[in-house]
Regions:
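Generic non-transmembrane alpha-helical segments
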Residues: 7-11, 15, 61-69, 131, ...
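Short amphipathic alpha-helical segments
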Residues: 4, 50-58, 162-166
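Long, positively charged amphipathic alpha-helical accessory segments at protein N-termini or as interdomain linkers
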Residues: 68-69, 104-169
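Contiguous, small/hydrophobic- and glycine-enriched helical/loop subdomains that border
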Residues: 35-77
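N-terminal lobe of the biotin/lipoate ligase/transferase fold
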Residues: 1-46
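A contiguous pocket-lining binding segment that forms or flanks enzyme active sites
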Residues: 72-125
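Short glycine/proline-enriched loop/turn "hinge" motifs that connect secondary-structure elements
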Residues: 28-33, 100-103, 143-144
Length: 169
């Protein structure tokens, strides 16, 4: 949907990433070895039918995995791929949640920033949009990404943490 997406994709490739179109979620994210992508699939029931209820299951799971952090769910508008169910600590986004309704079930997917250079990820997404959008026609449906609006679990916990350790939680 961006008029100059080829230029944006070129920028992503220059940074040694492979562009992929996701089947859920709204806007772009960066996936690398410091990011954990989690999918939570469950059957569609009367209890789980609401969109918010499905999101709340993932929020609860994440809060239980990290009781030492005050994880809240609300939109961080200056992050990349902002949404109502951004997970944040102290106003900085650590995760984004999307969902997809499937035949007899629900798939809730989360992008969780575990470790690595989150500022560089944010800068790359900002550069992607700067290259992909028409500068003469501003489009407010894309975020003006502030790389400082996002943070890793490793930074918050003030200790090294690996993706495998997060999986065990």
């Amino acid at each position: 949907r961006t008029p100059f997406v080829e230029k944006g994709i070129k920028k992503i490739i220059e940074h040694s990433y492979v562009p992929v179109i996701r089947n859920s979620g709204g806007l772009g994210v960066i996936a690398d070895e410091g990011i954990l992508n989690i999918s939570y699939l469950f059957p569609k029931t009367a209890d789980s039918a609401s969109t918010d209820h499905a999101y709340e299951k993932m929020v609860s799971l994440t809060q239980q995995a990290f009781p030492e952090l005050q994880i809240e769910a609300y939109e961080i508008a200056s992050s990349y791929c902002p949404g109502t169910y951004d997970l944040s600590v102290n106003g900085q986004k650590i995760a984004g949640i999307a969902q997809r309704r499937i035949k007899k079930g629900i798939a809730v997917m989360m992008y969780l920033s575990v470790n690595g250079n989150q500022t560089a990820r944010g800068n790359l997404v900002r550069e992607f949009y700067q290259q992909s959008l028409d500068p003469l026609r501003p489009d407010n449906s894309y975020p003006s990404v502030d790389p400082n609006s996002m943070v890793t679990l490793e930074t918050l916990l003030e200790r090294p943490i690996l993706v495998n350790e997060v999986k065990e939680r």
